[in-house]
Amino acid sequence: MIVAGVDEAGRGPLFGPVVAAAVILNEEIDGLDDSKKLTSRKREKLFLEIIKKSYFAISIATADEIDKFNILHATEIAMDRALERLRKKINFDIAFVDGKNLNLKFPFKCIVKGDSLVKEISAASILAKVVRDRIIVSYAKKFSSYMLEKHKGYPTQLHLKLIKEHGLTPLHRLTYKPVMELLSITQLEEWYKSGMIDEERYKKIISKMEVPLFGIQDTR
């Protein structure tokens, strides 16, 4: 039986995408574990070994999709995308997925703490974590005020302090409570009118803020 391991990185941050990876190992790799238990240096070393010794695919769901569909469904979307890409390279019988209460389009089994128990999931967790960190660091120059390279978008005291000082961006997850508490209607309207966020996302955020829609007829 060919098993693909699937995991995500980035459900908790306030900024940027959630990243999912799917992995089928071709060779044994020593030192695989939940990416959160490994140092950055160890993750990077294992990352290079995994991509040499496996079939893999990586995908994301954006902050826009997280706001529209919620983080659980956005995670499922990212995982399905990764599995779809992987299946184009090699067929598999089942996907073992870290976590619980997920619903994917492919045959799958959820395994609680799977990133520590199943080597394929451990490998996927490492790929997802390394790629997500690289994505966030790539934004650091454009959004230098937020010091993304230090906290990777997570809700640290530093990140929240910098949001209060410099405001938000459309790449922040605007439906997350710590972010929404700092989001002004004026800013949201400016992004919508300038095309930086679309109508669907605008409506979703407004509905969670429990304020009237500005200039938009709700057709639901």
Curated annotation (Swiss-Prot):
Reaction catalysis annotation: Endonucleolytic cleavage to 5'-phosphomonoester
Entry superkingdom: Bacteria
Keywords: Cytoplasm, Endonuclease, Hydrolase, Manganese, Metal-binding, Nuclease
EC code: 3.1.26.4
Cofactor: Mn(2+); Mg(2+)
GO annotation, biological process: DNA replication, removal of RNA primer; mismatch repair
Top-rank EC class of the record's enzyme: hydrolase
Note on cofactor: Manganese or magnesium. Binds 1 divalent metal ion per monomer in the absence of substrate. May bind a second metal ion after substrate binding.
Function, as annotated: Endonuclease that specifically degrades the RNA of RNA-DNA hybrids.
Full protein name: Ribonuclease HII
Organism encoding this protein: Thermosipho africanus (strain TCF52B)
